[in-house]
Structures are given as C-alpha cells and as structure tokens.
A protein has these predicted regions:
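Short, low-complexity N-terminal intrinsically disordered segments enriched in polar/charged residues
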Residues: 18-56
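Short, cysteine-centered beta-strand-loop-beta hairpins and adjacent loop/turn segments enriched
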Residues: 66, 83, 110-127
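A short hydrophobic beta-strand element
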Residues: 101-113
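Bacterial N-terminal signal peptides
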Residues: 9-17
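Bacterial N-terminal signal peptides that target proteins for export
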Residues: 1-8
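A mature extracytoplasmic/lumenal domain signature
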Residues: 64, 95, 109-111, 150
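Short beta-strand edge/turn micro-motifs at domain boundaries
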Residues: 104, 129-157
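A solvent-exposed, acidic/Ser-Thr-rich amphipathic alpha-helical stretch
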Residues: 48-100
Length: 157
C-alpha cells in the first residue's frame, strides 16, 4: 500500500468511528421515556432499538389486528409485515400519562396503506388515519407489556 492509500484508509476509519459516535442515541430516562423511545423505534423501523426496549418475554398486543407477540422476534416480524403494508406510517403521541410502572398513550396514526381493508376490499396506497390509545407496563427499564386499542374500521372512513 502506498502512503496515500494508507492515509485514505485512516481517514475512512475515522469517518466510520465519527459516524458511530454521532449516531449513538442518548440514554432513555424514566418509564415514559422508554415507551416514547419504543414508539420512535416503530416510526424509524428500528428493529435494533425495538429489540433493546422490549423485555425478552415482553408482550405487544394489537387488539384490532388480533396480534399478540411475545418477545422481540415475534414483534419485529409483525413490524416488518406492517412496513410492507404501510411503509410510510407515522405514529404520533398526542398525550401521555404515567402512574407507577404504567404508561398510557393517546396517539394518532397516518399512512399510505396497501392491502385488504376491513371489508375485504383490496386497496393500494390509500391514505388512512385514526386515533387510538396504548397501555404499557415497564419493568426494570424494559417494556413488559404494550397493548394497542383502536377501531381499525375508523381508519378507513
């Protein structure tokens, strides 16, 4: 290797380290912060963050979609399916309440949806939106349970 090649390799190595340090997320504080970070992980399609925030045996329920996943692997698979149907979803917390280890959220959801609507009709890139609530239980800095409640039909009105 030439001196110039060595210099390029060193510069690239510094760039990679700088990016890694820059991208490092700040620690999350408090149960509400953990739950907010979980919602942000969904918005960013960040399976690594989701894996970090959900307890190994943590449960995520989406009551409207009849989904109940245990552990990060099942929840990440659900997330990936949702990303296929709604690649641009935006989950926005409008209010949050914390009492002990329980965090309650009010939220809105908006996306372009492709798939079957609640009536079984195939739709492509249809804009949907709606409101819902979630109840989360945090234990030892991890989400033990996260349950979503909403009327899925209202998203298609």
């Amino acid at each position: 290797m030439t001196t110039r090649s060595n210099a390029v390799v060193i510069i690239l190595a510094f760039a990679v380290v700088a990016c890694a340090v820059y991208e490092k997320k700040q620690p999350v504080e408090g149960d509400k912060g953990i739950v907010t970070a979980y919602v942000n992980a969904w918005n960013q399609h960040d399976t690594v963050a989701l894996d970090t925030l959900l307890a190994p045996e943590g449960i995520h329920e989406d009551i409207a979609q009849n989904f109940r996943g245990r552990g990060p692997k099942q929840v990440i698979n659900f997330m990936r399916g949702l990303i296929v149907a709604e690649p641009d979803f935006k989950w926005t917390i409008t209010n949050s309440y914390e009492e002990g280890r329980v965090v309650a959220l009010e939220w809105t959801w908006a996306s372009s949806y492709s798939g079957k609507d609640p009536n079984g009709k195939q739709v492509t890139n249809r804009r949907i939106s709606g409101r819902g609530t979630s109840i989360a239980e945090v234990e030892d800095g991890k989400i033990k349970r996260f349950s979503d409640y909403y009327d899925i039909a209202s998203f298609f009105r």
